[in-house]
């Protein structure tokens, strides 16, 4: 699961976009970006339908999937030099649900 709130398909969401396009290490099962919820990640990148859904939030994703993904990937490159408090709380929520956290920051 890749978190990319309000940035998927934009320059600050390049990590998430790259993972949707190609990943040998991770199986991407969804993107979290409430501004694009209900859409297909591949189509939002101007490509073919990928079958990777975009969810409003983690709870929406977990309700739609029949399992909890192994990883929660922070797929944004924020302008700030730190992860904002609100997003840190979302990371903690994913940890409490048993997900490993992956971040390139």
Predicted regions and their residues:
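Short internal beta-strands
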Residues: 27-35, 102-105
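Glycine-rich, highly charged phosphate/nucleotide-binding loops
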Residues: 46-65, 83-87
């Amino acid at each position: 699961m890749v978190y990319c709130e309000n940035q998927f398909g934009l320059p600050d969401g390049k990590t998430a976009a790259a993972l949707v396009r190609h990943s040998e290490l991770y199986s991407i099962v969804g993107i979290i970006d409430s501004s694009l919820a209900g859409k297909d990640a591949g189509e939002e990148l101007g490509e073919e339908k990928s079958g990777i859904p975009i969810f409003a939030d983690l709870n929406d994703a977990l309700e739609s999937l029949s399992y909890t993904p192994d990883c929660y990937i922070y797929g944004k490159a924020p302008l700030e030099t730190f992860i904002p408090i609100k997003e840190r709380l979302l990371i903690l929520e994913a940890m409490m649900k048993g997900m490993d956290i992956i971040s390139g920051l």
